[in-house]
Amino acid sequence: LVLVSAGAGGHTGFVTGFAFVPAIRSFFDGPIILGGGIVDGAGIRAAEVLGADFGYLGTRFIATEESLAPESYRDMLVAATEEDVMLTAHFTGVPANYLKTSIIAAGLDPDTLKARKDKSFEGRHDGPENNKAWRDIWSAGQGVRAVDKIQPAATLIAQLKAEYETAKAKP
């Protein structure tokens, strides 16, 4: 079972992992994967301590060399902080975290976006050039500050493993 908690990029949850995992674990004994704001090996270990079996990272992997994301998206992630992440239901009718800079680059004003009343996962917006979420409007999790460079996925995985082992060794 994948739990998307508060802080996740894209369509996000509203409950923190600290509350979500124990609540689900109280009635579900199968595998749990926790996502949302996990950016390093210590966060993966924290997910396990909470009762999850795995931690899920998304935003960090978008900025890897192997990612199919446009270079401009990856560069935007490297430059971003949590202050650049905006929660809005404007594009799909479902709240999601997006990079404000991508909204601005698409010719929209983040301060004037209104939530859709309907739900549509086409992600279209009737603004300049009919921008589309996932193509023109890019998501990121609140832990985006941890994306400090574009690197090979293998390098990121090795870093996460080392951080995880360090966190696991702590009493």
Regions found by a protein language model. Give the residues of each.
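Conserved beta-strand positions in the central sheet of alpha/beta enzyme cores
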Residues: 2-3, 56
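Glycine/charged-rich beta-loop-alpha catalytic/anionic-binding loops adjacent to active sites
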Residues: 5-7, 29
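Short, small-residue-enriched loops and turns at beta-alpha junctions
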Residues: 8-13, 63
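Conserved active-site-proximal phosphate/metal-binding subdomains
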Residues: 17-33, 39-171
